[in-house]
Amino acid sequence: MAEPQPASSGLTDEAALSCCSDPDPSTKDFLLQQTMLRIKDPKKSLDFYTRVLGLTLLQKLDFPSMKFSLYFLAYEDKNDIPKDKTERTAWAFSRKATLELTHNWGTEDDETQSYHNGNSDPRGFGHIGIAVPDVYEACKRFEELGVKFVKKPDDGKMKGLAFVQDPDGYWIEILNPNKMATII
């Protein structure tokens, strides 16, 4: 195991690698399938994630006895979504990098209801990231759509990437993967 590093410096590359194990062969078909965000108002969130960010609603699942709904979104062609419910469910759960939005019924009508985005104390969850071909063009469009920015592309020390907020205040990093090496 690597030597502990002072909190101010983080792990060295070597120390980080020494903390990692080679994946067990039994995990070769595992994939990161989804991340989940709790949402207050599905109408606002679905509009934001589809119209603003361009995701496609893959499937909606309702759980009446527990009073919540799940919405699964991803960057997929809506024409590829199977029509048969059983087939669609298996297909939706086999996609990579799916965003699951969880709506607990009634939260949209509760003015005191809000979710913690993890970027203020107590810190925890930080953000999701969306890769785009051109950060500046994407942000120009977001501005025209009235999207709330946490960081515009030329703000701060890390130029060329941005952070926007969804209707619940969750942060979304907007990045161009081909430019990240020059930013970090």
Curated annotation (Swiss-Prot):
The modification N-acetylalanine is found at residue 2. Glutathionylation at Cys-139 inhibits enzyme activity. Phosphorylated at Thr-107 in the presence of CaMK2. However, this is a consensus site for phosphorylation by CK2 so phosphorylation may be mediated by CK2 rather than CaMK2. Phosphorylation is induced by TNF and suppresses the TNF-induced transcriptional activity of NF-kappa-B. Its cofactor is Zn(2+). It is an enzyme of class 4 (lyase). The keyword Chloroplast does not apply. Its EC number is 4.4.1.5. Substrate binds at residues 34, 38, 104, 123, 127, 157-158. The modification N6-succinyllysine is found at residue 148. It holds the Pfam family Glyoxalase. Homodimer. This is Lactoylglutathione lyase. It comes from Rattus norvegicus.
